[in-house]
Amino acid sequence: MLNRISRKASSFTESVIREMTRQATLHGAINLSQGFPDFPAPADIKRAACDAIEADINQYAVTWGAKRFRDAIAAKTKWHLGLDIDPDREIVVTCGSTEAMIATMLAVMNPGDEVIVFEPYYENYGPDAILSDSVMRYVTLHAPDATSPVWHYDPDELRAAFNERTRAIIITTPHNPTGKVFTREELRFIADLCIEHDALALTDEIYEHIWYPDAARGIEHVAMATLDGMRDRTVTINSLSKTYSVTGWRVGYAIAAPDLINGIRQVHDFLTVGAAAPLQEAGVYAMGLPPEYYNHLQTEYQRRRDFLLGVPEETGFKCYRPDGAYYIITDISEFGFQNDVEFTQHLIKNIGVAVVPGSSFYRKSEMGAQQVRFCYCKKDETLEAAAERLRKLR
């Protein structure tokens, strides 16, 4: 029988991250792999969703997003980023940020166009490039070393990646999997290259509220769209998932100039029609939460980060301290395993903890063969139980 699967679908595998969740369930391991909380979503946000269902907001919303939700997104963007967004012309609501990214790439990339991505990178971007017939160009994020205490890129390498075929660059800040928060200076350098080469910036900012202040180093989240010259050439992608601990709701959005949004809306319409109407209404409530909510979120995740950082370090891992998001990349070379996949299988089956093989974040598996990623968006009891199991490695 002929192969009935397309060449595109045959050129990538299922998500390694989500496979690790399935293996954690199969073997009864504690899941520190996939980035979803195991603690309850905020009660008031859940109540807003229930109220919306009871109010019979259960039919299709406008394809590109319910009016009230788009207005709420625009209002939050104004107070948080200082940007005036037209909710009727510059926003599209999608089924999660995952759909926002693929819809954007399908809308703006032509066959053979190049998209630059920093490596290591979130695994979805590879299939997104394949599905949109675009070519990925990779720029290395170097791990902290003698030249820099944080993950960093080489400006010369980045400049060399831009050429006449460059259509876009993907920037994830705070970054998954490294936890890097791009500085204003780094983003300005990227912005200048985008302007010089007439390229778009596709920014994945789903962790915009999950970063850890450091006065000495000036850690802050900077949105690319706020930089001079970038308002109309940036597609800002976001969602409810991480900020409001509702990863299963699948409600995201993209903000961009009207011509870009028109294209993204067209693709979105025929991909999914629209995001869940009652959950968009709950999003109206979430977007109106006061600054204290975000301060508490930040404090809680910083506390979890600080707890989990100490455990791998005392058991033989070399940890790279994240400045944002809720992941920790670690070096496993001290354990003597052949590669990350072999090590993660050992952790799941013999130790009872599931993490993500580092190779899933690189184009060549050998580049991440001595790395694994931990996730700490979990209950204290979960992290403490995982710590107890990890101490068996000593």
What kind of feature is each model-predicted range?
Residues 1-5, 10-11, 16-28, 36-52, ...:
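PLP-dependent class I/II
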Residues 64-65:
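Short beta-strand to alpha-helix junction loop
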